[in-house]
Amino acid sequence: RAVGSTGSGRHLAAVLLGADVVKNEITAHAVAASHLFPGAKTIIEIGGQDSKIIILRNNIVHDFAMNTVCAAGTGSFLDQQSARLNIPIQEFGDYAVKSGHPVRIAGRCGVFAESDMIHKQQMGFPVEDIIMGLCEALVRNYLNNVGKGKKIEEPVVFQGGVAANRGLAKAFEKILGLKINVPAHYEVMGAIGAAILAREQIELSHSPTRFRGDNFVLEGNFTSNSHECSGCPNLCEVVCIKRDNEVLAYWGDRCKKW
């Protein structure tokens, strides 16, 4: 048994669970893709809040880029549009692949994309063509921003929660002219990669896992507080995590004083 943590909340999860390995999302996604698709060269990852591209060579991260500024093309933007159209997000991709003639949607900005979609609705275009047009616009936006200057080669793996949208996978294939592979567990590839790394760490070190057990989290009373450290001009905001009034960890201090 072994536990790994990754993602934006990996440090907090590591403290609560007792993780054996703490890895960034780039490494975790790369490990998972290489494990399930040996020889993979390009990873397209689009989640709820951000998107990224990872270039692999010989199963090693060669280059990567992330977009954490603009929401256009992320899962949250697609959720907003599915709600506006009164279509369950689970069916969004199904509508898109039924399109016969996708309409051109401006996808460089989420605000403009939504405005353009409304305009196309008012003109009477079928909703399937509008949704597929949105998918193609988001793919162009992704390639012009996140994928700019990157050499995208096969095998290409599409992962992250947005990979559930068959319309986006189809749009990537159409625009890139490449086959897009979607893993069975596309939404948790980062977790799979962290788990693989944790298992390897335990096997190499021959040491017991640091996993605290389910009850540690389920039965404990957790609290957190923060304060500004005045020990130096950095004025770091230090966060303290406690379980039943026992300090588990501090972080946020640059000098590791706490």
Where are these regions (language model features)?
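Adenine-nucleotide phosphate-binding core of ATP-dependent small-molecule kinases
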Residues: 115-144
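Glycine-rich phosphate-binding loop plus the immediately following alpha-helix
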Residues: 58-101, 200, 243-244, 251-258
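Conserved phosphate-binding/catalytic loops in two-lobed NTP-binding clefts
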Residues: 20-27, 173-192
